[in-house]
UniProtKB/Swiss-Prot annotation:
Part of the 50S ribosomal subunit. This is Large ribosomal subunit protein uL22. Keywords: Ribonucleoprotein, Ribosomal protein, RNA-binding, rRNA-binding. It holds the Pfam family Ribosomal_L22. The gene is rplV. Belongs to the universal ribosomal protein uL22 family. The keyword Ribosomal protein applies. GO terms for biological process: translation. This protein binds specifically to 23S rRNA; its binding is stimulated by other ribosomal proteins, e.g. L4, L17, and L20. It is important during the early stages of 50S assembly. It makes multiple contacts with different domains of the 23S rRNA in the assembled 50S subunit and ribosome. The globular domain of the protein is located near the polypeptide exit tunnel on the outside of the subunit, while an extended beta-hairpin is found that lines the wall of the exit tunnel in the center of the 70S ribosome. It comes from the Bacteria. GO terms for cellular component: cytosolic large ribosomal subunit. GO terms for molecular function: rRNA binding; structural constituent of ribosome.
Length: 123
């Protein structure tokens, strides 16, 4: 039997931003509806909001196009940022030394699902 509420996801890979900074934004939108999350992302003062907004719009577009779901009925079920490969650079310092610079990347994953009808009537 098919799952009545499928999860539709979108992934952005190799985003040139630290996963710690992206997780700070994802923790705020997890569990919220699509409309609430868009409003939050628009007014939060973090640079990580732009790539997260793009992935969220992509996940909702996937739900609309592939599953025929209404964006107003979608809630963010999963949102996480995994660490990607680190670009290693070196900063020259005095007396022949060099300090390492780690340019971190991350993979952002957002999954949306329709709001459960029994959960909406119970509250």
């Amino acid at each position: 039997m098919a799952d009545p509420s499928p999860e539709i996801k979108a992934v952005a890979r190799y985003i040139r931003m630290s996963p710690y900074k992206v997780r700070r934004v994802l923790n705020q939108i997890r569990g919220r509806t699509y409309a609430d999350a868009l409003i939050l992302l628009e007014f939060m003062p973090y640079a990580a909001c732009e790539p997260v907004r793009k992935v969220l719009r992509s996940a909702v577009a996937n739900a609309e196009h592939n599953n025929g779901l209404d964006p107003r009925d979608l809630v963010i079920s999963k949102a996480y940022a995994d660490q990607g490969p680190t670009l290693k650079r070196f900063r020259p310092r005095a007396q022949g030394r060099a300090y390492p610079i780690r340019k971190r990347t991350c993979h952002i994953t957002i999954a949306v699902r329709p709001i459960e009808p029994e959960a909406a009537t119970a509250s």
